[in-house]
A protein has these predicted regions:
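Solvent-exposed, acidic/flexible segments
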Residues: 5-9, 24-31, 54-62, 79-86, ...
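A structural motif
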Residues: 12-13, 27-44
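Alpha-helical segment that forms one wall of the substrate-binding/catalytic cleft
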Residues: 40, 44-100, 113-117
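Short, functionally critical alpha-helical segments immediately adjacent to catalytic or ligand/cofactor-binding
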Residues: 8-24, 33, 65, 88-97
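Long, amphipathic alpha-helical surface segments
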Residues: 103-122
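N-terminal secretory targeting signals
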Residues: 1-11, 117-122
Length: 122
């Protein structure tokens, strides 16, 4: 999947990897995906199942994130009437289903934003 709700994912994946693990240099789990995150993805996924070890595989991790975002950005859309942005997705990744509205994820977003093209939103 190259985009999600019109949001290009490749630049966001790159930025998240930099913030979470210095692009894999400081952790085997590039995106710092937790067991709870994997369990949640397996619960909401219709036809895919992931193992905890799959967190160490970059492409499988990215697929888990896509599933997670597809599910939880719908809540964002329903509550705000707006399409998600890089900020929305990054904050959901960091703060869980309602991470987009948690104050504590704003600092995380500022760090991610620095690694995006032009340091800008979507």
């Amino acid at each position: 999947m190259a985009t999600l709700f019109g949001v290009a994912l490749a630049p966001l994946f790159t930025a998240l990897a930099q913030v979470e693990s210095n692009n894999g240099q400081t952790s085997k789990n590039v995106y710092q995906i937790t067991r709870q995150y994997v369990d949640d993805v397996n619960r909401i996924s219709d036809n895919e199942a992931f193992l905890y070890e799959d967190r160490n595989d970059r492409s499988k991790s990215e697929r888990m994130m896509e599933i997670y975002w597809l599910y939880y950005t719908q809540r964002y859309i329903d509550q705000t009437g707006r399409d998600p942005t890089w900020e929305t997705l990054a904050r959901i990744h960091n703060g869980g289903p309602d991470g987009w509205k948690k104050y504590g994820t704003k600092k995380y977003w500022r760090r991610v934003k620095n690694f995006l093209p032009g340091g800008e939103e979507t």
